[in-house]
């Protein structure tokens, strides 16, 4: 009986140790894992982050939230941006200023506004101008970049009565989008926004980049 108990304990330990070491740095990063601006490359970020929560406390919009299992076991309680809750304020550098370990670099305002933490994608099946032919310019209005990362393609469509109308359909410029998330936060399609941010295109990763032809 003792031998069987010992074998079970040993086998459990052998399985458990590798599981604790699994993190997104060793596999494809998850789209919802949007790290604060100035965050180091994921493996080094997780090594340095002590999960103190200081960055989350100072976040002006409350957008920085604790990660659960999105970053593996190692990443539990590390910060990630959840645009549905709050966006990354364009000129804010507080998270890097309070980070005690350098997991999030201290950035000047000028440096921060050039950092990409993700990329916006439009779901045309939910976007009001695309799906319903209804006028909506909310995402473009709130885009904070000096040259708007969201622009409009004007398209003429037919209405139900056989008439024609012109609708402005939003388009994301991936070169200008910094992934701040204000477009997702402000989108009037509330249950599941028609424009959403993923971690694709983040400045800190050479691997997590969209294929733009």
Locate predicted features.
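Non-ligating segments of multi-cofactor redox enzymes
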Residues: 1-213
């Amino acid at each position: 009986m003792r031998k069987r108990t010992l074998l079970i304990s040993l086998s459990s330990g052998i399985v458990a140790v590798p599981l604790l070491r699994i993190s997104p740095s060793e596999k494809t990063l998850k789209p919802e894992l949007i790290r604060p601006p100035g965050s180091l490359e994921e493996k080094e970020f997780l090594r340095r982050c002590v999960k103190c929560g200081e960055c989350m406390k100072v976040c002006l919009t409350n957008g920085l939230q604790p990660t659960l299992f999105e970053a593996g076991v190692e990443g539990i309680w590390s910060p990630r941006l959840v645009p549905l809750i709050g966006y990354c304020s364009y000129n804010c550098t507080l998270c890097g200023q309070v980070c005690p370990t350098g997991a999030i670099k201290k950035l000047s305002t000028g440096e921060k506004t050039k950092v990409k933490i993700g990329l916006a994608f439009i779901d045309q099946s939910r976007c009001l101008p695309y799906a319903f032919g209804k006028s909506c310019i909310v995402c473009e209005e709130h885009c904070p970049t000096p040259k708007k990362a969201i622009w409009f393609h004007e398209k003429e469509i037919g209405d139900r009565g056989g008439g024609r109308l012109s609708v402005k359909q939003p388009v994301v410029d991936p070169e200008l989008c910094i992934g701040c998330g204000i477009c997702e936060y402000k989108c009037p399609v509330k249950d599941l926004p028609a424009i959403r941010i993923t971690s694709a295109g983040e400045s800190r990763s050479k691997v997590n980049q969209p294929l733009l032809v």
